[in-house]
UniProtKB/Swiss-Prot annotation:
Gene, per the UniProt record: metH
Keyword Methyltransferase tagged: yes
GO MF annotation list: cobalamin binding; methionine synthase activity; zinc ion binding
Binding site for S-adenosyl-L-methionine: 954, 1142, 1197-1198
Protein name in the entry: Methionine synthase
Amino acid sequence: MSSPLTDRSARLQALQHALRERILILDGGMGTMIQSYKLEEADYRGERFADWPSDVKGNNDLLLLSRPDVIQAIEKAYLDAGADILETNTFNATQVSQADYGMQSLAYELNVEGARLARQVADAKTAETPDKPRFVAGVLGPTSRTCSISPDVNNPGYRNVTFDELVENYVEATRGLIEGGADLILIETIFDTLNAKAAIFAVQGVFEELGVELPIMISGTITDASGRTLSGQTTEAFWNSVRHARPISVGLNCALGAKELRPYIEELSTKADTHVSAHPNAGLPNAFGEYDESPAEMAVVVEEFAAAGFLNIVGGCCGTTPAHIEAIAKAVAKYPPRAIPEIPRACRLSGLEPFTIDRSSLFVNVGERTNITGSAKFARLIREENYAEALEVAQQQVEAGAQVIDINMDEGMLDSKAAMVTFLNLIASEPDISRVPIMIDSSKWEVIEAGLKCIQGKGIVNSISMKEGVEAFKHHARLCKRYGAAVVVMAFDEDGQADTQARKEEICKRSYDILVDEVGFPPEDIIFDANIFAIATGIEEHNNYAVDFINACAYIRDNLPYALSSGGVSNVSFSFRGNNPVREAIHSVFLYYAIRNGLTMGIVNAGQLEIYDEIPKALRDRVEDVVLNRTPEATEALLAIADDYKGGGAVKEAEDEEWRSYSVEKRLEHALVKGITTWIVEDTEECRQQCARPIEVIEGPLMSGMNVVGDLFGAGKMFLPQVVKSARVMKQAVAHLIPFIEAEKGDKPEAKGKILMATVKGDVHDIGKNIVGVVLGCNGYDVVDLGVMVPAEKILQTAIAEKCDIIGLSGLITPSLDEMVHVAKEMQRQNFQLPLMIGGATTSKAHTAVKIDPQYSNDAVVYVTDASRAVGVATSLLSKELKADYVARTRADYAVVRERTANRSARTERLSYEQAIANKPAFDWAGYQAPTPSFTGVRVLDEIDLAVLAEYIDWTPFFISWDLAGKYPRILTDEVVGEAATSLFNDAQAMLKKLIDEKLIKARAVFGFWPANQVEHDDLEVYGADGETLATLHHLRQQTIKPDGKPNLSLADFVAPKESGVRDYIGGFITTAGIGAEEVAKAYEAKGDDYNSIMVKALADRLAEACAEWLHERVRKEYWGYARDEHLDNEALIKEQYVGIRPAPGYPACPDHTEKGTLFELLDPQGLSGVSLTEHYAMFPAAAVSGWYFAHPQAQYFAVGKIDKDQVERYSQRKGQEASVSERWLAPNLGYDD
């Protein structure tokens, strides 16, 4: 007879085989079935607990001992229904949960019995059907307490359970489950990820102790419409936090029904490189807490999961029964299991939100001001235990651009461990801070470990090293791995810190090999700190410190696969402490070279970085001499001019307290929504004195504010930690009012219809949508505006919740077209019966007819050309008399468009890609003298004078944005629209003056020039100052057959080929006038003034484009200087009567939006422009323009047009990506269907 371990090993092999073959079935709700038995107190007690001093009814785990027959009968019923995996009835079998009944001493026994009983039932079923073995998952539930959330709203740093207590509980439970015969460990219903991390830590410890390793299943719980866990994490952030467990599956269960769970399971299925499970509830509970979704109804939804390829394991949770499981098993039986995707290696961190770093990422700013050793202010606040202001320091770092925050509490007179724990617990209740990953920084291991026990996300340990020997290094690394943290590894060994390049490389290589080969540490989670030491100290041996570090970064990048690099940047300038301008210049120059050589991240003051090209040349030259150790006299030369720059840094700390100027009612609402307690008592008192009775403060502004909080929470715009903060504010306000209270002992016309409007996911443009909304609102329609960047599931959920009559989608950038198709598909899948309106700059009748309309047949899909047509379309769609005829005509029209498009595509002949290359322009490069820019590198122009930019505005697009057709200035005297245009223009001038005079918005530009050459006909290599390749720009070539011998153009044609030997150049720019525009527009919206809100955004757009025009003129005449004698008025500029071009990625000459990412990497790796890119490469703020500069005298604007598959395949090869990825981004340009 084989041993139990051998039997378990055989079962696990069978499990792996089964997962490859089919979708496995998990059982259903145990609690649901127990309730069906209608057990009484006596059943729970049995003989053994007849005299137990407290009630035990409801302790379902106790039935393992008092009514095992019931538990096994339920388990057998699930196996008979088709379940492959039984969950043990041990959801609450931990001491902390059993303590509610005074039964904590039974925890171990309950887990043993739970696994033993399930094992018996599973083995009996396997004996009946040997070809289909059944498995037992030992359940570890979440417990009744949370490690990340305080149970006391007045004390956010308090916890009623610790990580260590949970580990102790889970260790005991895991031992019992293994002893009882479990095949797997299932950590489920995770609403607080820190609890789950404690469970993982415990389970892995037991495995190591017992010398056995079982597969781990992990299942989280998305609790509401926000798509987050109760403790605030998104689905991807949750996965990043637990993936170190290397689970056999990750999934979601409970809280939501299958329908509501779908978008989160879909996301998980694309992100997780392991099997995916789902065991949703039987719908959502009704008013009586019961579940109404029938087996057939639930199976229909779950079958969609399987058909879409989301599932490897599926079962049920609350409200599900054996009948549900049987229906689900039958529904998914015909579908193959989900194929596990290959996810690229990357350091995947998380706070409340995910954060991914890889070799292609822009430089990562790690905020340093929450480091006691780096900030005197922060140190003082911590010593004074002024944690409220200390949290503000952290928040300022995040708002200033820190993507990770470094927290260090090492100070001789401080209890560092206690301070670290307190501060991290408080951060957990501050979503604006805890959304980013945490770097726990300490030289004391006990402080690091205490910090790791406080963060639910995947953070970074700073640091471990071989300073105390290899064994201690490996011990700490193993623990970091078990806690699920990335690590900063110092270049430090038994002989001390590495100070030379050779020592840095030697220690980093040795550390890497030990971590990867001996510890099994993921290489992508290793971040080397090769030691940044102070330069310009006057000691000759220190002169090469910066060069050694920079070269070490390059070594790490080139020789240690997937590893990253970091450093404490302020160390390099320590010898100039007290002289902030010089220090900032040193930091900027140092980072400029270190980033180019592979530095991934740096601990910096996120709000205080000087711009490399903005450093005065005299200072920058001396600093570069010091940083790069170019001359022996570099230090003396820098010291000689250092005092000239002394007297304050480039960036000042400032607190934004603008909201304090609001009315007291608005201040109270703001405080409640933001969770600010600082002024709540004085504001409450001020409001009390304005009211007739103190109770009116509660019934009025306080309840109004809490209604806002409730609305935001219900809509998924706030989540639990924020609501807890709001409740704390409310309590303080009410507490102030109670003594005063005790001392005292129209009809609305019906809307024509409700229309939901949204700018789709990935797109931030909303001017057109807002105008349409205003027009519809003025015509009696109730408009529900979801804003920008709205995912499909939110659009559809809101349409149902708001009982909308029409859904309207808007988008400006080409990737939005795909997202609209996705929404249409989802509407069809979910059987919506609502009309769909499509609008936006990139949309068209042809795209709507060809791509969107065929995806949704339940109701009409209508392309709306402009705001003026929206009312007529809406009226037709909602009219009983007009709709049928209108929809029929629209569909017939679209059928014609589709046929015409198909015929045109079939008729159109194009050159092969090779033929198109052969027909490129023939320029005389041998005789070409490329103009040389006045500088190379990047410069920033901050707070550009808006009055100057106003002279460059092209007003014609402004009128078009308001749906007034005509060319400026003739439109002002147009017979039809002249009066309206003039009135609008006068209002625009008044608003423009206000924006300029009051400096309500700001304009900024980042631009640069680099040496460049054409390679492979259609690509451009961009070079650094030393000739190294900084980036490759990928362009496309026209393939349409040209008449009269005209060439097939590519933007690459306008730069000299590499083989010509000509040193040519390219430029790039980002301009924005949107800084502050969103806030100004929202202020008008808050007053109900949609007109001026839209006006502000429209003018910001025009100013951003004007800024691009103004800057291009300066480039031509000054910065590049190839047209110094140019004299063009604004009309000539608008007509593009200049030499050179400034094409924008995503537009006709370079239609691939992803190239914008390369432009931003070259121009703005530190985020100094104030403009960022969304996942679909839209710029935010929306009032922004970016593009390339070409100076060749024959450079011209053109459209690439339709291209064929041969070019797409070559383009994809050059970009190093799958052709399907290129096809998605180039969809409007594809001249083929498959």
